[in-house]
């Protein structure tokens, strides 16, 4: 982009950001090539970072050889391909299908993905609405990110049923980290578990979510801001935090002996306190310096990871 195009993209980025804030970061229609470029600058870095973080947790939950068998992916509502690129970092994907109904997002996404992925990845783009497209081919991984909060429950159920049917291994849903999006994620969770899906992450099992109705489960990732990104956001902070929630479902059972850290660890002198969701529900665990390796692990741990060295409750 030349200087004039960059300035236009920055101005549009700020307007897009305002629209996303008004709609709680849910999907906003992109009506021009310039708006798609503005989205690339202002929102894609964060959605990519969230997807990369989530897929990393999913891979950890799968372990080997399961994660190594993920070779093909369907990205439903692909946008510019943020989730696709993120998944390629966690899995050895060599075949990718991106479904995107917005013309300008799809057009820029095709160009960006060719540039970002090189020639080694076989990518097919489809001009279709994920809520109505008939899927005829199966994929190891199906993913839908930053989309389900826009769908009515009936449409969402139909869409997820269709995606689950063509999933060979895992289905991953990623949404903005808000209470409203978490509620919609719980709806999707209940629907998929009822269809026979096996809970993979972040929940330790398919039991009813143990959180009270006024609480919710979300994670966050910190990403750096470049010069153009700072201008688009209208600030000088060198980083931003993207909150997200996710759920991953599997066709086969994976065994996890740990518990998920669902809050930022509290680090104090001589001990650390972790809020965990495990097979026995939610518990708060205090790990002290005298616990040796467990204490060192707790000091390094971050929200979203699996903690294996559970010692004692508060």
Placement of each model-derived feature along the sequence:
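N-terminal auxiliary segments of SAM/dcSAM-dependent transferases
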Residues: 1-25
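Conserved class I S-adenosyl-L-methionine
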Residues: 69-79
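Conserved SAM-binding loop of SAM-dependent methyltransferases across substrates and taxa
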Residues: 80-93
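Conserved beta-strand signature within the Rossmann-like core of class I S-adenosyl-L-methionine
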Residues: 167-177
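C-terminal lobe and adjacent flexible extensions of AdoMet/dcAdoMet transferase-like proteins
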Residues: 232, 236-314
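A short SAM/SAH-binding and catalytic strip from SAM-dependent methyltransferases
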Residues: 140-154
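Class I SAM-dependent methyltransferase Rossmann-like catalytic core
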Residues: 29-54
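Conserved SAM/SAH-binding beta-strand->alpha-helix loop
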Residues: 102
């Amino acid at each position: 982009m030349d200087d004039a195009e960059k300035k236009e993209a920055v101005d549009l980025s700020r307007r897009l950001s305002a629209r996303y804030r008004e709609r709680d970061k849910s999907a906003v229609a992109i009506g021009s090539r310039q708006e798609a470029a503005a989205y690339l600058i202002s929102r894609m870095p964060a959605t990519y970072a969230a997807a990369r973080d989530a897929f990393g947790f999913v891979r950890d939950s799968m372990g080997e050889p399961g994660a190594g068998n993920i070779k093909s992916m369907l990205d439903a509502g692909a946008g510019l391909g943020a989730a696709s690129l993120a998944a390629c970092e966690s899995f050895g994907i060599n075949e990718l299908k991106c479904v995107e109904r917005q013309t300008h997002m799809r057009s820029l996404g095709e160009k960006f993905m060719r540039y970002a992925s090189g020639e080694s990845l076989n990518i097919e783009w489809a001009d279709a609405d994920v809520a109505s497209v008939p899927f005829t081919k199966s994929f190891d991984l199906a993913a839908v990110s930053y989309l389900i909060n826009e769908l009515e429950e009936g449409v969402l159920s139909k869409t997820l049923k269709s995606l689950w049917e063509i999933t060979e291994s895992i289905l991953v849903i990623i949404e903005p980290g808000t209470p409203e999006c978490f509620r919609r994620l719980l709806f999707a969770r209940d629907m998929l578990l009822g269809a026979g899906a096996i809970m993979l992450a972040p929940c330790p099992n398919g039991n009813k979510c143990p959180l009270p109705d006024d609480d919710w489960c979300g994670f966050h990732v910190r990403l750096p801001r470049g010069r153009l990104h700072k201008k688009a956001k209208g600030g000088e902070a060198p980083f931003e935090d993207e909150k997200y929630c996710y759920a991953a479902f599997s066709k086969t059972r994976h065994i996890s002996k740990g518990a998920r850290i669902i809050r930022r660890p509290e680090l104090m002198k001589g001990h650390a306190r972790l809020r965990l969701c495990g097979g026995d529900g939610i518990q708060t665990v205090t790990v002290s310096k005298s616990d040796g390796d467990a204490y060192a692990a707790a000091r390094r741990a971050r929200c979203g990871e699996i903690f294996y060295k559970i010692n004692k409750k508060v």
